[in-house]
Amino acid sequence: MSDVVETLRLPNGATVAHVNAGEAQFLYREIFTDRCYLRHGVELRPGDVVFDVGANIGMFMLFAHLEHPGVTVHAFEPAPVPFAALRANAVRHRVAGRVDQCAVSDEAGVRRMTFYPDATLMSGFHPDAAARKELLRTLGLNGGYTAEDVDMMLAQLPDTGEEIETSVVRLSDVIAERGIAAIGLLKIDVEKSERRVLAGVEDADWPRIRQVVAEVHDVDGALGEVVALLRGHGFTVVAEQDPLFAGTEIHQVAARRTAG
C-alpha cells in the first residue's frame, strides 16, 4: 500500500496533501465553507488545545490552525495513507501539536480495521459493503445527482477494502501521558466507533473538556446514548442532521459547557 500523496490548492489559497481530490474538496466545503464544527455556540479560542480524533488528512486540524494560529492540535488517524497526508499537512502548515498514527477507543492495544482507498472517509472498524454503497447513493441523490449518475459512479467503486492493523489508545491515557490540563474542543469522526471513543474518557477527565463535536451514527440507540452521556457530564447538547445526510443514520452532536 503506497503512502504517496498528491497536493491540491484549496479555494482559500492553502495547499494540502490529500488522498483523492473529491474527498478533499468535500471536507473543505464541510469544514471551511459550512464551518460545520463551529455551530451552536461552539468556538475556538486562542491557546486552545484541540483533539482531532479521526483526523483523516487533517482538514479540521488545518481549519483550527488557521482560525486561531495559537491553538495546539493533537490529531489521531489510524490508516497509513491518510496519515501520510495528515503528517505532510502538519509539517507544511507548521501546525503546533502532534499527529499520531493510531485509532482511539475504550481499550488500548492493537486492532484490525478496514481501509477503503477510494472512500477513505468510510474506513473503520465496522465494514459493511452494502451499507456503504447505500450511504454513498443517498449522499449522491441528496447532493443533486441523478439516480443514473449515482448508479454509474457506484458501479465503478471497488466493493472491497484493505484489512490493516492499527494501534489503539484511550483518550484518558493520552491526557495523562501528555499532561493535558484542558481540552478546548474534542472533535470525533470515527465511523460508528464514537461511543467507544467517549467511553475511553474517565470521569475525572471530563471537567477538562470544554466542548465536544462528534459525528454520530445512530445505530442501536447510539445518538440517544451519546447525548445522555454528554448531558450527564454537564454539557449543553444539540443534535442535528445536515440535509445532505437526510435518510441516513448520520447525525452531528455539538456539546459545550455554558460557563468557562
Curated annotation (Swiss-Prot):
Its EC number is 2.1.1.-. It comes from the Bacteria. Optimum temperature is 34 degrees Celsius. InterPro entries: FkbM_mtfrase (IPR006342), SAM-dependent_MTase (IPR052514), SAM-dependent_MTases_sf (IPR029063). Optimum pH is 8.5. One of its GO terms (cellular component) is cytoplasm. Keywords: Cytoplasm, Magnesium, Methyltransferase, Transferase. One of its GO terms (biological process) is methylation. Belongs to the FkbM methyltransferase family. Involved in the biosynthesis of FK506, which is a macrolide antibiotic with immunosuppressant activity. Catalyzes the transfer of a methyl group from S-adenosyl-L-methionine to the 31-O-position of 31-O-demethyl-FK506. Also catalyzes the methylation of 31-O-demethylimmunomycin, the C31 transmethylation reaction of 13,31-O-bis-demethyl-, 15,31-O-bisdemethyl-, 13,15,31-O-trisdemethyl- and 31-O-19,22-cyclic-hemiketalimmunomycins, which are all structural analogs of FK506. NCBIfam families: fkbM_fam. Monomer. This is 31-O-demethyl-FK506 methyltransferase FkbM. It comes from Streptomyces tacrolimicus. The gene is fkbM.
